[in-house]
Amino acid sequence: MKKSLVLIISIITFLSFSCVNVNSKKMTIDTKKDKNLYEKKISVFPMENVEISNDVIKIFPQKENTTYTISGYFNGQIVVMKKNTIIKLNNAFIENTSSRAAIKCEEKTEISAAKDSVNYVVSSGRGFFTNAALQSERDLVIGGSGTLFIRGYKCHGVEAEDVKIKGSGDIYIEGTKAGSAVTCDSFTVEEGKTFNCYLLNSKNGIKADEEMKIASGNFYIFNNDVALKTDDESENKIQEQCLLALAIS
């Protein structure tokens, strides 16, 4: 059953409009289908202030706002250690089969999908870790004009303090029924963004503990127990009213 609405979100004192489509059908990210199409060796440019071992890549630029372009296949963890670093994925397949985050950001980081590129960030494997495929201890910006698939087989797709989505690309995020596609303190989309964001097969599509401000973008929510969730009880009631007012088609 397909449900569509223009969702009115009022978190704290902020009112905004965004197009959100809710669908009960299942749509999943196939992380095996295209893996062999990627270069077997990871490429990071520039190589300054980059340390590569067997299963860990550490990126620690001297200056903020430094951009690193990553291409190819890597099984392990990329650790971003400097504030305001920009990671541009250009046909990259980053996975961690040791059940840890594929990309871990110790400071505020931007993850951007390059134009016309298709990229994967995947966390899987056995173990007791319940983290996310893309994880930040601080703020996280996700954007670009390419395609980005994020899948967390262990718990969440994306986890950060504050999450901001921007750009004009296609972003697919999948967690588990024990976690969220996106979990954070605050979730923000500014005006004028044209991206498509697909939130798939999780307990919560977006779980924002403190606030949610969505002013633009297109959201497609497939097979999540709760589409949008905040810990503010009054705002949960607003969201419930919006969902009850869906036009069923």
Model-predicted regions and their roles:
Residues 4-21:
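Sec-dependent N-terminal signal peptides of Gram-positive bacterial secreted proteins and lipoproteins
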Residues 19-249:
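A composition-driven surface/loop motif
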